[in-house]
Design a protein with these regions (language model features):
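A short, active-site helix/loop in glycosyltransferases that binds the activated sugar's phosphate group
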Residues: 261, 266-297
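Nucleotide-activated donor-binding/catalytic signature segment of Leloir-type glycosyltransferases, i.e.
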Residues: 364-384
Length: 388
């Protein structure tokens, strides 16, 4: 039995979906259940292995849609600037280093290579851009070998992506993706797939699913239909990670589902089980399905997170101390919390608020702190291990 967990992307400031998967991975390992975590998005800025390792996943438990049809392993990047220099067929006449970018110039050919490092000060190269006569013509992406190449041509004085080529370990071509704006055609030696939807459907069909396997759909945007159609004979589960409906739009006869779950709920008869994080949400969903749909789905409650043991403070707790730990995203409303603490400070001078996490709202929070001169009692802590 294998449990396949279907997701889209992952980042350095991951959402609760990825943390839920990380908790799930730990539980599966502790109980001896084989599990794979599948990511469907294209990753251009980082190596997927770096992102998943950061969350505690093992490389062997990760499947990337785009590398599945190659023989490449999920692995950290080891390609170096020296490796790149050996492969450049021209005389390198000048070198420039600016932060995470190393540029190698070949003056005679009017070409330069821009190597983007994994980290500033390291020699590890994530990708290389080749610029000829001022025009971007190619990007190469690396892990322990070249994973894939993007090809560009100038259109209206802009670099236009028209093809990606994916490689095997020996450098042979596994398949091509022909790109036309937001549309893609995937060309294999023995078949042509006319869309990413067909690509995902083909991927699902190649997993060799049996009636002993389980597919858990964590995110379905752009993938739901292909997954639903190609899961059987395995069982299909859907995780509800957020509020599943719009309370303001509910009437006696209609309900507005969260758009991220609308497809799954509309096809609930094809889902073997739904998972909610709380018994309250499960109860609400059952009532709503009974009232607004012809379906009576099987819904189970499994809390998202867990701790391996209960930790207690070694000394006395810090009085009047508040913390929050999350992505600093708009929907988390951490700015509301910061403003509330500023207000509370007026009647509770000892209050202290530590904000853990990073994200798009960080600058906004800094502004709130500075405008209210709250630096002494509201602190941005960034990413930290809060286990202990």
């Amino acid at each position: 039995m294998t449990v396949y967990n279907i997701n889209l992307g992952i980042g350095w400031a991951s959402s609760g979906v990825e943390y839920a998967q990380a908790y799930r991975s730990t539980i599966f390992k502790n109980t001896g259940i084989k599990a794979k975590f599948v990511f469907m998005d294209m990753f251009l800025q980082d190596n997927l292995s770096d992102l998943t390792r950061n969350m505690g996943f093992a490389d062997e438990d990760i499947i990337w849609l785009y590398s599945y049809f190659t023989d490449l392993k999920i692995a950290p990047t080891t390609y170096t600037v020296k490796d790149l220099e050996k492969e450049i067929p021209y005389d390198i006449t000048r070198r420039e280093i600016n932060g995470k970018v190393v540029k190698l110039f070949c003056a005679k050919e009017d070409i330069f290579y821009a190597a983007y490092l994994r980290k500033e000060g390291e020699d590890i190269v994530h990708r290389v851009e080749k610029v000829s006569r001022g025009c971007l013509i190619r990007k190469d992406f690396y892990s322990y070998t070249k994973m894939f190449t993007e090809y560009y041509t100038p259109v209206d004085n802009k670099a236009h992506l028209y093809q990606r080529r994916f490689f095997n370990e020996d450098g042979s071509v596994a398949y091509d993706e022909i790109v036309d704006g937001k549309d893609s055609v995937f060309r294999f030696p023995d078949k042509i797939l006319s869309s990413k939807h067909e690509f995902i459907a083909y991927f699902m069909s190649q997993l060799g699913l049996t009636d002993q396997d389980i597919v858990i759909l964590d995110r379905a945007t752009g993938t739901g239909q292909a997954v639903f159609r190609n899961t059987k004979p395995a069982k299909l589960g859907v995780v509800v990670h957020a509020e599943h409906f719009s309370e303001n739009a509910v009437t006696d006869k209609t309900i507005l589902w969260n758009n991220f779950y609308e497809y799954q709920f509309s096809n609930a008869d094809k889902v073997d089980f739904f998972i909610t994080a709380t018994e309250r949400q499960r109860s609400i969903m059952l009532d709503q399905f009974n009232k607004y749909t012809p379906f009576t789905p099987h819904i189970v409650t499994i809390p998202v997170g867990s701790v391996d043991k209960l930790r207690k403070p070694e000394g006395e707790r810090k009085p009047f101390s508040i913390i929050t730990a999350s992505r600093l995203a708009n929907e988390k409303h951490v700015d509301w919390l910061a403003k509330a603490v500023v207000k509370a400070k007026e009647s509770l001078p000892q209050v202290n608020f530590d904000i853990y996490g990073t994200g798009a709202e960080e600058a906004k929070l800094k502004t709130i702190i500075e405008e209210n001169q709250a630096q002494d009692y509201i602190h941005l802590k960034g990413h930290q291990d809060l286990t202990e």
